[in-house]
Swiss-Prot record:
GO cellular component, as recorded: cytoplasm
Region of interest (tRNA (mnm(5)s(2)U34)-methyltransferase), residue spans: 1-269
Region of interest (FAD-dependent cmnm(5)s(2)U34 oxidoreductase), ranges: 295-697
Name assigned to this protein: tRNA 5-methylaminomethyl-2-thiouridine biosynthesis bifunctional protein MnmC
Gene for this chain: mnmC
Compartments where found: Cytoplasm
Length: 697
């Protein structure tokens, strides 16, 4: 089936099968949402559906929930979380066209359009109405995506919108290889090919039902539209019943669905409690998330604080300096673009969605604050054989053109408005921003809510667990008590006894500030080589080039050699033109900062593990994985460290991830990536292989 045919099928199926009034007639009442919202005792209500299409169900739910909140302002439920899956996502232009016919949803559809991502696989989190509504949009085959959705023992979904009749429509003319259909009988007179397709679609539906059951909470409701096709409907109903749903057929809305379809409704009874993560990668929420302390004053602290505050959490931010963003987040300009390769490994699967979320986050922040930034694009030069090979490998990943694409020499010159004599790749959605201004703007926004207390010049130097709370002691002996603590102080994480074994390290980086000139002032994009050069910051009339890289150094003093090397790398990488040689560094204007990095280029985000207990508990993990117990952790103690040089692209999603985990909300990344971000991952990898652990293994 061609992409064009699939796209038209999605558009037609959503336009012709159902309307906003039908959604209100079928999906919402059959799940009893209005009455359930009134009696709901949790802060966030989670709906999941099996096909996003044009977003009609999502938009209708947004409108209905908002109207409910307006009519019931004292209700406990404050937020709506919507999880949806789509194997064949529409382009943004097609989505806009499809939703134009529903002007009543304009408030929500315009926000959806603004942040709707390109067709990159995995989860894309979109936040609407300042966090009151959250959409997790999973692109890819639903049978691959659903097992990647994290859940705890209790489940995460409160209501399911499912349409099994669309499974077969989406899979027309697609063959399922290696599938056994011997146990399924479909009574029809169709051709052998048609029967095979129907059997494959049914097997896919059964796989989906298993995932639905794993993700559903106790008392979670479901509506399921199925085909009237032989005994297929009975197989699906039986499977839902065996999965824990008490199912009945609804005859109240026969005029709202096709006569060839059937509507089943039900709810979960006696759920079998089961998480879907390995015990050594467990992510535990806080036992009390009402009061959280964050140690640190950079962009990771600011994004995490704002994500928590959106969830109604009171946050105290302990900053060792007199002002936030005086450390690694204090630079004038930083590039924002994703770290991609052609392997579809955890780096790509994290940094792709993280970059899209960072753009969304920055654009939303800019609506309420002023900070220097420019989505001017990022150009990465193929300046030598190694960089060319790396770029070619990355391009083999077949990413959407709107994310990254190749430029020849002439196109590179036109795009950058500067001569380099190299081909390149271009990230059209990338750009630069001022990390210091952004961080301070975010903290100001958080303070304006009344939920953030900023304690400047308070250098927390030790933590102690006392009476199920954390006691924080600063450098002058003052003590503070909080229920939950987040360590987000960059390379200084190792000063805390509980976190010192996390295998991250410090990296000194010095950025040079250079005055603009006639050539540099024309630069239109961030230019990356074995270093980077930013376009002019119109506020300072300067550019940034850098940065040096000195591992295991926390020295902040100006270094003449590193200053010279910043220019020399520019000259070395772009040798055949004059303008790099004319860059003026004579004023010795620069800034040094210390980043916190990891060997695998991924941060450490989540529960902090008890290192010695982990070694003892998992000493035989290679041979006893089936009986392994949950990883030992420090209760209510978390980290967000090791962001390296990609903090601007990753911090917003990491802050959202950590806030989601602490508050027990659905997580915005697939299992595989969550495991790759776990603070204990490197220790567990060695233990699984039967290797011993040493210091910072």
């Amino acid at each position: 089936m061609s992409d064009k045919h699939i796209k038209q099928t999605v558009l037609n199926s959503n336009d012709n099968r159902i309307s906003p009034s039908h959604v209100c007639d079928i999906f919402l009442p059959q799940n009893g949402l209005s009455e359930r919202w009134k009696a709901f005792t949790r802060r966030r209500f989670v709906i999941a559906e099996t096909g996003f299409g044009t977003g009609l169900s999502f938009l209708t739910a947004c409108q209905q929930f908002t109207q409910f909140r307006q009519a019931n302002p004292t209700a406990t439920v404050k937020e709506l979380h919507f999880i949806s899956f789509e194997q064949h996502p529409l382009t943004k232009s097609d989505l806009i066209k499809a939703t134009e016919k529903w002007p009543e949803f304009a408030h929500f559809s315009q926000q959806l359009h603004a942040h709707y991502p390109p067709a990159v696989s995995d989860c894309h989190r979109i936040v609407l109405d300042e966090g009151l509504i959250t959409l997790d949009l999973w692109f890819g085959n639903i049978t691959d995506s659903m097992p990647q959705v994290w859940t705890n023992d209790d489940g995460i979904v409160d209501a399911w919108f499912t349409d099994f009749s669309q499974i077969e429509a989406a899979d027309i003319h697609q063959t399922t290889e290696g599938t056994t259909t011997e146990s399924i009988t479909i009574e029809n007179n169709a051709s052998e090919s048609s029967a095979t397709e129907s059997n494959a679609a049914l097997l896919k539906s059964l796989t989906i039902i298993n995932s639905i059951a794993i993700l559903a909470r106790e008392n979670s409701t479901i509506h399921a539209i199925t085909y009237h096709q032989g005994n297929q409907q009975d197989v699906l109903e039986q499977s839902l019943t065996e999965a824990g749903f008490d199912m009945t057929e609804s005859h109240n809305h026969r005029n709202s669905i096709s006569p060839t379809h059937r509507l089943l409704v039900g709810s979960v009874k006696n759920r079998q409690y089961q998480a879907n993560s390995k015990p050594w990668f467990t992510r535990t929420s806080a036992t009390d998330a009402s009061d959280v302390a964050i140690i640190g004053g950079g962009v990771a602290s600011a994004t995490t604080a704002l994500a928590l505050i959106r969830r109604g959490v009171n946050v105290t931010l302990y900053c060792a300096d007199s002002l936030p963003a005086e450390g690694a987040s204090g630079n004038r300009q930083g590039a924002v673009y994703p770290l991609l390769n052609g392997s579809n490994d955890c780096l790509t699967r994290f940094f792709g969605p993280a970059f899209f979320y960072a753009r969304q986050f920055v654009e939303q922040a800019a609506m309420n604050s002023t900070f220097s930034h420019d989505w001017c694009g990022v150009t990465q030069l193929a300046w030598d054989e190694k960089s060319t090979s790396k770029i070619n490998k990355m391009l083999s990943g077949n990413f959407p053109q709107e994310l990254v694409h190749a430029l020849d020499i002439e196109q590179t010159k036109q795009k950058t408005a500067i001569t380099s004599n190299f081909s390149s790749v271009y990230y059209p959605l990338g750009g630069w921003l001022c990390p210091q201004e952004l961080t301070r703007a975010l903290i100001k926004q958080a303070q304006d809510t009344g939920r953030l207390t900023l304690k400047s010049d308070v250098d927390i130097c030790s933590l102690e667990s006392t009476n199920e709370q954390w006691q924080l002691t600063d450098s002058t002996g003052n003590q503070f008590t909080h229920n939950t603590v987040i360590i987000a102080n960059g390379h200084r994480f190792s000063e805390f006894e509980q976190a010192k074994q996390i295998p991250a390290y410090s990296v000194r980086g010095q950025v040079s500030h250079i005055p603009t000139d006639d050539t540099l002032s024309t630069l239109k994009t961030v230019l990356c080589y074995d270093g980077y050069l930013t376009p002019q910051n119109t506020t300072t009339k300067t550019h940034c080039i850098g940065a040096s890289y000195r591992r295991n150094s926390a020295d902040l003093a100006f270094c003449e050699a590193e200053h010279q090397d910043n220019k020399q790398r520019l000259v070395h990488c772009i040798p055949d033109v004059e303008w790099p040689k004319n860059v003026d560094i004579s004023a010795n204007q620069s800034r040094a900062g210390v980043r916190c990095a990891s060997r695998d280029h991924l941060p450490f985000v989540g529960n902090i593990c008890r290192y010695e207990a982990l070694i003892e508990q998992y000493k035989d993990l290679r041979d006893n994985q089936a009986t392994a117990e949950t990883v030992p952790i420090y209760a209510n103690l978390y980290s967000i460290v090791g962001l390296g040089s990609r903090g601007l692209s990753s911090a917003p999603l990491l802050g959202e991830l950590l806030a989601s985990q602490i508050c027990g909300d659905p997580l915005p990344l697939p299992h595989t990536v969550l495991n790759a971000l776990h603070p204990g991952r490197m220790w567990v990898r060695r233990l699984v292989r039967g290797k011993q652990l040493g210091s910072k293994s």
